[in-house]
Amino acid sequence: MKKALAIIAVFALALSAFVAVGLAIRGTTPDEPTARPTPSPTTPPPASVTEAPDEALAELYSQRIEWEPCDTNPDNDCGTLTVPIDYAEPEGETIDLALLRVPASGARVGSLVVNPGGPGAPGTSYAAAAANVFRQPLLEGFDIVGFDPRGTGDSAPVDCLSDRELDAYLAGDPTPDTPVEEQSFEESVLSFGAQCVAASGPVLGHVTTIEAARDMDVLRSALGEEQLTYLGASYGTKLGATYAELFPDKVG
């Protein structure tokens, strides 16, 4: 069985300074019961929400997420978001990004998109752990929405080697100091790269921070949000800053 490349993320306590939650949320006392509300609006969003930066992206920006209870926890919702592999060719091949939503437990304010960093850590797992990560006022007022960035997790993951091949590659000499060892090292690296290309296809060339940030704007539109309310940790702050540079008028 093949294994996607994994990068262990550090779940930092520092939150993104670039895109902040700027809304006050009324909390409840611990003794007050809470019920799961309908987490997202059912009416179509205004045209200003789904307006695409490029006319060729209009269909993708108008998509709505079909949420269903997650298999792992039916209290959470799972879905997918369709994005182009290459934004320079918006009518070309597409991939689906994995999404997970923890519905607001109280009076809903909106959606909060989160990313744990890495780069490459699964945002769906981060959102699923929301109760252990975020304070109660945030959980009451916001749907916590996580996504696996393109090329990671369940979002068209980059794939290279089988488990056995990866073990053999990692067991190689990382510091070659003879001509023979240098040649062996070079051959193994080239083979690794070639297998990544063969197994992953065109998505391998499109797993950049800029493309992940553009994916977040498609997600904002699909969530029916006029502006993106976002919280990132570690590398997630870079992703948030990149989004703010690309879409300054869409920052919440």
Predicted regions, residues:
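Secretory targeting and sorting signals
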Residues: 1-23, 81, 216
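Charged, compositionally biased non-catalytic regions
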Residues: 4, 12, 25, 41-56
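C-terminal region of N-terminal signal peptides and the immediate post-cleavage residues
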Residues: 16-47
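Gly/Pro-rich cap/lid or specificity-loop segments adjacent to the active site
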Residues: 48-252
